Amino acid sequence: MTSTKISLTQTVQKGGCAAKVAASELREILKQVKFPAAHPALMVDGGLFDDAAIYKINDEIALVQTLDFFTPIVDTPKLFGEIAAANALSDVYAMGGKPKTAMGILAFPLATLPKEVIVDVMQGASDKIAEADANFVGGHSIDDDTLKFGLSVTGFVNPQQVWTNAGAKVGDHLILTKPLGTGTLTAGLKRQEVQEADIMEALQSMATVNNAVDYMTPVLKNEVHAATDITGFGLSGHGMQLANASQVSLRISFSKIPRFAKALAFLEKGFLTKAHRSNAEYTKEAISVAGLESLQQHLLHDPQTSGGLLLSVSREVSADMVQALRAKFKSAEIIGEVLPRQDKAVIFEP
């Protein structure tokens, strides 16, 4: 453990998933890249902007591959490692799979931070990988000006039980497993307006592994028609992507959305990130926010780090699903439903 107090958020300009390249800008960049033709065994590639790639090996096993890394979103090194790992592991769970191996991705400023920080970050990650019943099998590191850490994760899933963001069915209920608000709360932390202890509920949520699949019976798992995790593009952006991929529309009630107690207050204080604005720009033509106040709209665009899963589930089992999920995810809630395609991809109502 590090012997002196280090505030990692003060060593970077932006942190967590709020540091993502804006979605609209990224799409324009990727349009200029000529990618090779997809192999027939690829069940999911980058075309749908899903959470991970899936490569079918045989009729019983498919490979799930993803990676995620970012700059510090919290001050404590070990907690940063825990959150970075939980965030990377989440993409495998969002596809219905289970992680098996993880490799570390580390950029570290050797000239400005003590090496003990690496130990703490790696230990935090190792603890979460073990919690996911996966193996930490190595990685790669470089000396850099800014600390960055994350994981490349490989998992497995039955090809017949893959979740994607493209399978939502009209009539499904939408379930969100974690509260919103990590973007604005951690913005307050970076501005040194609060201490970690003041927003511990959100920090613990970010460090919570998204293994919702482990709390589902086989029957419940089969009733998940689509899934994605809510991260840097916010509920608005990731919800829009799911609706577009599934060629449906989502109707979501703001009053049903779980949120951290201080989130709206922090937004009112102006604790916004660049991602709040880029997410609003990204989704402005595709979502409806009629009747919502500006602070409520900010929360929809709030960039989540290691946010919850958004599940599109048969309405016949949605109540049972929520009850099962609340064994771990206490805030799991039905927040809306899937509609036939409308003019807007996502319709947010009060």
Swiss-Prot record:
Q: Where does ATP bind?
A: K20, L48, F49, D50, D68, D91, G139, H140, S141
Q: What are the EC numbers? A: 2.7.9.3
GO molecular function (one): selenide, water dikinase activity
Which top EC class applies here?
transferase
Q: Does the keyword Transmembrane helix apply?
A: no
- UniProt superkingdom: Bacteria
Metal-binding as a keyword of this entry, yes or no, is yes
Q: Where is this site: Important for catalytic activity?
A: K20
The Gene Ontology biological process terms listed for this entry are: selenocysteine biosynthetic process
Supply the alphabetized keyword list.
ATP-binding, Kinase, Magnesium, Metal-binding, Nucleotide-binding, Selenium, Transferase
Active site (catalytic residues): C17
Q: Where does Mg(2+) bind?
A: D51, D91, D229
**Family designation:** Belongs to the selenophosphate synthase 1 family. Class I subfamily.
Question: What is known about what this protein does?
Answer: Synthesizes selenophosphate from selenide and ATP.
What's this protein's name?
Selenide, water dikinase
Encoded by which gene?
selD
